[in-house]
Amino acid sequence: MSFPRGSQDRSVGNSSPWWPLTTEGSNGSQEAARLGEGDSPLGDVRNEELAKLEIAVLAVIFVVAVLGNSSVLLALHRTPRKTSRMHLFIRHLSLADLAVAFFQVLPQLCWDITYRFRGPDWLCRVVKHLQVFAMFASAYMLVVMTADRYIAVCHPLKTLQQPARRSRLMIATSWVLSFILSTPQYFIFSVIEIEVNNGTKTQDCWATFIQPWGTRAYVTWMTSGVFVAPVVVLGTCYGFICYHIWRNIRGKTASSRHSKGDKGSGEAVGPFHKGLLVTPCVSSVKSISRAKIRTVKMTFVIVSAYILCWAPFFIVQMWSVWDENFIWTDSENPSITITALLASLNSCCNPWIYMFFSGHLLQDCVQSFPCCHSMAQKFAKDDSDSMSRRQTSYSNNRSPTNSTGMWKDSPKSSKSIRFIPVST
């Protein structure tokens, strides 16, 4: 993609019109470059083979994203279990992914079929606004979800202070902020008249930038707001989360070793309460930490998928505007075009990540369809067998109520402390 210098204010086309960041590309790069230089365009043509591939890829992404995220929303709606804060964030992240499917992928699919934008000026501006709005919403919903995990792990006492209200406020803020930050699209894109086919004129939805710095400023700002800033916040939150978990595990390991050493020497060391030595029971703490760590792992995988899917797209965007020798055409760089299209795979991956880490969501989703009742019964049987094994293990590990001395608590024990008789 080359941006000719010299004009103060120039209209340029949208790269494979769906992509809201790039200003020239697969559908308009040759025309825009030549129009900016004052030359005649080669004609209103495009690489039809690449266009067919784009249409096929976008169609698959759209169907998979809609089915996957709709299934998650249906499972969350029909689940008989009590919904948690994490379920609330998953619901809104699924809504953001559906926004990507309907506001990004679907317009691009229609645009690739028609080649030129078919619609009035207001529709051009609305489509461009919604495309960037979906990108902001998906990124910022990940940020607030990770921030919630940071608060739950590093500041657990704050989760007792109206957690539902705080979660809803965080989610509402991300939606509103995404809408506001995407409004400049209304003033950048519009339907303008362009010249093709040796004098023939047509209309398309293009962007207008002040040269030479307008394009670079726009792409750099969008990359920073949609990708760089969220990744920095996500990385910082996960740095604190990992440090807190590591410190917690190290403390438990040291406490366990200290306890074993005291048993071997026959010495009792610890705080006293009414003639009894009080020691923390690690089992119940482990069960709570295990649940938190599972949600942290799920959020980490979602964030990793977001970075892996979107990083190539933003790298190409920055490369295209800062390297004057970079040229993007349909026939010469089909791999770059497809790599950009695959960025929306992130919206397809998220539903399966939810179901993998929350097995009951898959079960509730299957139960929503009458044709899958046999599979749902299999899930229910597996859950019943698993619960039976846990109850058997619990009863075998418990000591009779009239026993004295020490015993090994079951991992599912609700006791948080144990009392060891100490001679006084």
Swiss-Prot record:
Sequence segments annotated as region (Disordered):
1-40, 383-416
Record's comment on post-translational modification: Palmitoylated on three cysteine residues, of which only two are identified.
Effect after changing residue 115 to F = 17-fold increase in affinity for oxytocin. No change in affinity for arginine vasopressin or 1-deamino, D-Arg8-vasopressin
Q: Where are the transmembrane segments?
A: 53-76, 89-110, 126-147, 169-190, 221-241, 300-319, 338-357
Q: Which cysteines are joined by disulfide bonds?
A: 124-205
Pfam families according to UniProt: 7tm_1 (PF00001), V1R_C (PF08983)
Q: Which residues carry this modification: Phosphoserine?
A: 410
What GO biological process terms does the UniProt entry carry, in alphabetical order? calcium-mediated signaling; cellular response to hormone stimulus; cellular response to water deprivation; G protein-coupled receptor signaling pathway; grooming behavior; maternal aggressive behavior; maternal behavior; myotube differentiation
The record gives the membrane topology as: Multi-pass membrane protein
InterPro entries, per the entry: GPCR_Rhodpsn (IPR000276), GPCR_Rhodpsn_7TM (IPR017452), V1R_C (IPR015076), Vasoprsn_rcpt (IPR001817), Vprs_V1A_rcpt (IPR001224)
Its annotated function is as follows:
Receptor for arginine vasopressin. The activity of this receptor is mediated by G proteins which activate a phosphatidyl-inositol-calcium second messenger system. Involved in social memory formation.
Remarks, miscellaneous? Overexpression of AVPR1A in the brain increases the duration of social memory.
Q: Per its UniProt record, what PANTHER family does this chain match? A: NEUROPEPTIDE RECEPTOR-RELATED G-PROTEIN COUPLED RECEPTOR, VASOPRESSIN V1A RECEPTOR
The Swiss-Prot or TrEMBL record describes its family as follows: Belongs to the G-protein coupled receptor 1 family. Vasopressin/oxytocin receptor subfamily.
What name does this protein carry? Vasopressin V1a receptor
What gene does the UniProt entry assign to this protein? Avpr1a
